[in-house]
Each structure stands twice: as C-alpha cells, then as structure tokens.
Amino acid sequence: MTSEVVIDVQQKDISIALMEDKQLVEYQNEPREASFSVGNIYIAKVKKLMPGLNACFVDVGYERDAFLHYLDLGSHFNSYQKYLKQVQSDRKKLFPFSKASKMPELEKDGSIQNVLKAGQEVLVQIVKEPISTKGPRLTGEISFAGRYLVLMPFGDKVSEIGRA
C-alpha cells in the first residue's frame, strides 16, 4: 500500500488530502490565517544566539521572534537538519523519508552555538503559543499527533495512547 499526502496552498485556504493507493482516505480544508497554533511546523531562520541562556531567537513569521532553548532541540535534531537540506536541494522532486539517514544524537549538555548559527534555517514546531509581549516557544523534536498514536520521525520507541 502506498500513502501520499497532497497539500494545496491557495491565497485564502489550505487543503490537505491523504491518499492510499490513489484513493482519497481523508480530506481537510482550513482557512489560511496567520495564527501561530501549538503543533504548527515551520522552516524558520535563526535570528540571534543567546549563549548565556543556551538558546536562540528564531523568526517564524510572527511579529516577535520565537524562543528555542538548546534542550528543546531534541536528540534527533541533526537528523532533521540533514533531511531538511536533502529536501531543499531539489524542491521539484519529492525526497522519500525512507531514504533519510539517521545522524548521531545531539549531546544533552552541549552548547547552542556549537549547533546553530545566525541565519541558519531550522525545522521547528510550536509548543507554546505567543503570550502578551513574548513570541511562541519552539521545539526541534517534531511530532505528528493522530487519533491513536503520535509519530515522532527518527524515534526508536513505539508507544500507544491509552484511553480509560
């Protein structure tokens, strides 16, 4: 069985279709508005490194820069970065995730300036919405929540969601 996600971005709305063996399985249509909701995934640009905080500020398109701490990069950050480069190298051709290679895990006690630099593009997900004068809070550990499971690319564990 082959699965395919088709995303159509128009000026006023975004349509997402899930196809399995060329048959439509699921379809969603959402209005396109500039809301920064928890779970949204962006390719963002590092604006400013803050070595004292071991963090950085990242531009995701919001009026204020988002905050990304080193510990929130996630252990598979290097794998995401390599995959992002491979996908961006030829945007006309789909790079299958099955061909992505897993990189060594990020050190837990490392420094943000050894991993990121200003102007670098990173794949991030919003974990906390903007509040008052603060921008969104980000993570580099991407996850896709479904009805019965949560997909974490490059992850080694399999866990199920239990409902009582």
Please describe what each predicted stretch is:
Residues 1-163:
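Single-stranded RNA-binding surfaces
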